[in-house]
Amino acid sequence: MIEINNNHNNGNGKQFPSSQIMPDSKKKSIVKIGEYTLGEKIGRGAFGQVFKGLNGKTGEFVAIKQIDSNKIDESSLQSVKGEVEILHKLRHNNIVKVLGVVEVQAQLNFILEYVENGSLRDVIEKFGPLSEELCIIYLYQMLQGLAYLHSNKVIHRDIKASNILITKEGVIKLADFGVASQIDSESQLRFSVVGTPYWMAPESIEISGCSSASDIWSLGSTMIELLTGNPPYYTLQPMAAMFRIVSDQHPPFPTDISKEFLDYFQQSFKKDPTQRPTAQELLQHPIFFTLQKVPPTLSELQSTLKTLNGGRSRLRTSVNSIDWGSSSSTSGSSTPLSSSSSSSNIKSIVSDEDFNKLQTTIKQQAQTISNLSEEILILKKELKEKPKLEEQQFYKEYFMALAISVKVNQCYQDKTCEPKDMQQLYEMARSQEIPWYKLIEWIPSQLISNDNIPQLTPSSSRENISLSNSSSSIPNPNQNQNQNNKSKSKKFGFFS
């Protein structure tokens, strides 16, 4: 009988089962590009496919963007080469690095930094729309990358989720610079229609000049994409979407977003590109104040103390179990420890003094962090209340100016007072000798309308003030209209 052995020798005398051997049918042909081996396809760029690659010398994984120069026109080829020239000069943590270029016959192979988690478009397709908190974390990194680009006179011109990569640690990388341009100065504009319709700025569509401000608009559209799962106007055909981008005041904003995020969108989507903040300026936007969290190191320090005390107990037990009078040698004989200093040095490891010093230091650090945490919470509360205070002050100044204007006009017609009296009246109101909200009683009701009142949304927490119980030593020239004015003020609920 012939015995069949299904195990195979690996050349070192060791056997392994045949199930671990790759069949010839599954073996793929190895494609070498310089010192790199081409792997699986991982994506598609503006002008070609992207593959995973392995450096055969260093073991480093890379992304290899392949472009057949025979299949694209000369202008596109120049655009691709421009991408390499731009990226090769840039070194920033939030921008994909170009490691080199390998040209094989008519094929260009761009060796890029490999970003393992793919694009943010991949992320939202797998996990759905992102939370506002996570979007803010990503947005901050995108702005850092854009600020670096713009400081180097480079505009991306195609910012969107599919062109923004993310590492497994959550680090954002701007990528795909196939349509990027370098400008000599901030005032120089690029006059060509490039980009992807749903993310394009109005000035890019109208060919009125693309600048770094166009990237700010596109980034705003990208944030809408991350928050909702889709870019603005995604239900429309590209041409219709571009028409709406140009004709609308701004794209539709997502619902249920914070006041800070709403303000960020309002700043980013200003139709006049010269009025949009720069990436560097947006890094100071209040939306990022929410990233300041109370340090979690208090609990970490408590855990450290617990571990420290547990370690001390275990170490003391181990040391006490040692027979300090003898030690086992390699020959098996027992030899007394001749040096008493050895014993004392070992025991000093678990001395209470050393542990207590370390414990005291950690407790002091914990107290310092606790104090800082309280200060951070106070600052966050003040920042949260600041917009309300500013809004209240705005209304106050608005109605004071309107009331004084009406009063001056009334006095001018009746010749009942001098301009200096008006100045005194105004100063009294500013110094709060007269309740400023009383001035609303001087304003004829027809002046208090939706057309005249600033279009701001009053805070829901603001209490309405009944003017019927307030008093003033200043005579009211519109006494017969008081009731109407009171109802108007209560209706809008501006005061608190």
Swiss-Prot record:
Compositional bias of kind Low complexity: 1-13, 458-486
Domain Protein kinase: 36-288
Family (UniProt): Belongs to the protein kinase superfamily. STE Ser/Thr protein kinase family.
PROSITE patterns recorded: PROTEIN_KINASE_ATP, PROTEIN_KINASE_DOM, PROTEIN_KINASE_ST
Entry-linked Gene3D superfamilies: Transferase(Phosphotransferase) domain 1 (1.10.510.10)
Protein name from the UniProt record: Probable serine/threonine-protein kinase DDB_G0284251
EC number annotated for this UniProt entry: 2.7.11.1
Record-level Gene Ontology MF annotations: ATP binding; metal ion binding; protein serine kinase activity; protein serine/threonine kinase activity
PANTHER family: SERINE_THREONINE-PROTEIN KINASE DDB_G0283821-RELATED, STERILE20-LIKE KINASE, ISOFORM B-RELATED
Region (Disordered): 1-25, 323-345, 454-496
Cofactor (UniProt): Mg(2+)
UniProt entry keywords in alphabetical sequence: ATP-binding, Coiled coil, Kinase, Magnesium, Metal-binding, Nucleotide-binding, Serine/threonine-protein kinase, Transferase
Binding site for ATP: 42-50, 65
Pfam name, any one: Pkinase
Swiss-Prot/TrEMBL catalytic activity: L-seryl-[protein] + ATP = O-phospho-L-seryl-[protein] + ADP + H(+); L-threonyl-[protein] + ATP = O-phospho-L-threonyl-[protein] + ADP + H(+)
The organism of origin for this protein: Dictyostelium discoideum (Social amoeba)
List of catalytic residues: 158
Extent of Basic residues compositional bias: 487-496
GO cellular component terms listed in the entry, alphabetical order: cytoplasm
Coiled-coil features, chain-numbered ranges: 353-386
